[in-house]
């Protein structure tokens, strides 16, 4: 009888240990989440099986949230194939497979309130509840103009480059959406925000003293990213990879000319979240990319960024 009770207590203790370990694993899992930002190029319709390859790539990355650019009607297929919730950044009456709609958001987690703007082609968002905690997510695209493959070779001073940057569509777009970013950025003590996508801009974080020898001795505080930093938003990739020499984070390249740049980003702000890791992935259009040992033909001309976060 004594041995019976001893064995019973041992089993109970082992069961308790198992429950504790299981609870710890579940809490650790739900306390972290992964975000991916990707411009898939024309809805991934420019190569055979392009949408299917987008799905395969996202499955290998396994993000909790995807901030997508150039959706162009492919969203429902991608979301249904992944089993993700899907939010199209457009007016509510817009068909989910509308071929003219640019931005979208995908999530493993439930959606909250929509975040509509007057400029849905280049900014919009939605609340997402991760482990019951609300985060505001924004997908973004800015125009590429003005653009130069090598601004350091334009013969301009720093001041002239900053004025050149303001000369066309991109700067005007940023100014239009700035009130939204200020509004939601001011509320991040209670509701954090994550902003990501294709900004089509160089970063002042990549044009500092460490890289000036690469840039004709120019240190350029590019307006587009500096504006976000001034709002308190953190460039997650550069935070986790502070050396732009060893980790350039290239997401835009061209085989025919010297045009390698980091132009796709995930920014964040909030007291309750912090980034823990960030990676960039890059391949050329219609060429293989290797993820987790699997070869997939790449459907886009942009690389993508993946950042892991945790709740504090």
Name every feature range the model reports, one short phrase each.
Residues 117, 183-193, 200-312:
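Metal-dependent phosphoester-hydrolase catalytic domains
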Residues 148-168:
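A solvent-exposed, charged loop/short amphipathic helix patch at secondary-structure junctions
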Residues 50-54, 71-78, 102, 170-180, ...:
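Stable alpha-helical elements in mature extracytoplasmic
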Residues 19-27:
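Hydrophobic h-region of N-terminal signal peptides that target proteins for export
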Residues 163-189:
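A long, amphipathic alpha-helix that forms part
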Residues 47, 65-151:
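Structured beta-strand-rich core segments of catalytic domains in phosphoester-bond hydrolases
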Residues 5, 10-12, 26-82, 95, ...:
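N-terminal, active-site-proximal structural segment of metallo-dependent hydrolase catalytic domains
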Residues 34-37, 65-69, 104-105, 136-139, ...:
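Structural recognition of the beta-strand scaffold that forms the well-ordered cores
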């Amino acid at each position: 009888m004594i041995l019976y009770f001893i064995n019973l207590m041992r089993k109970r203790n082992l069961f308790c240990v198992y429950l504790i370990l299981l609870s710890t694993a579940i809490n650790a899992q739900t306390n972290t989440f992964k975000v991916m930002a990707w411009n898939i190029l024309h809805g991934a319709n420019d190569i055979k099986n392009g949408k299917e390859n987008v799905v395969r790539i996202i499955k290998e990355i396994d993000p909790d949230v995807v901030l997508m650019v150039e959706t162009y009607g492919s969203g429902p297929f991608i979301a249904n194939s992944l089993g993700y919730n899907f939010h199209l950044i457009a007016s509510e009456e817009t068909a989910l497979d509308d071929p003219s709609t640019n931005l979208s958001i995908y999530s493993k987690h439930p959606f909250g309130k929509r975040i509509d703007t007057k400029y849905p082609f280049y900014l919009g968002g939605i609340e997402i509840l991760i482990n019951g905690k609300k985060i505001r997510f924004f997908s973004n695209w800015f125009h590429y103009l003005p653009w130069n493959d090598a601004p350091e070779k334009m013969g301009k001073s720093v001041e002239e480059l900053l004025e050149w940057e303001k000369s066309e569509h991109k700067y005007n777009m940023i100014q239009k959406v700035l009130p939204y970013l200020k509004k939601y950025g001011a509320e991040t003590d209670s509701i954090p925000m994550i902003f990501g996508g294709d900004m089509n801009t160089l970063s002042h974080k990549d044009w500092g003293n460490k890289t000036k020898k690469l840039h004709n001795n120019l240190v350029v505080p590019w307006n587009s990213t500096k504006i976000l930093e001034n709002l308190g938003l953190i460039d997650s990739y550069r935070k986790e990879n502070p050396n732009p020499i060893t980790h350039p984070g290239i997401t835009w390249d061209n085989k025919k000319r010297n045009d390698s740049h980091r132009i796709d980003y995930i920014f964040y702000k909030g007291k309750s979240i912090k980034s823990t890791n960030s990676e960039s992935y890059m391949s050329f259009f219609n060429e293989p990319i290797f993820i987790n040992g699997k070869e997939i033909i790449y459907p886009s001309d942009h690389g993508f960024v993946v950042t892991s976060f945790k709740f504090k």
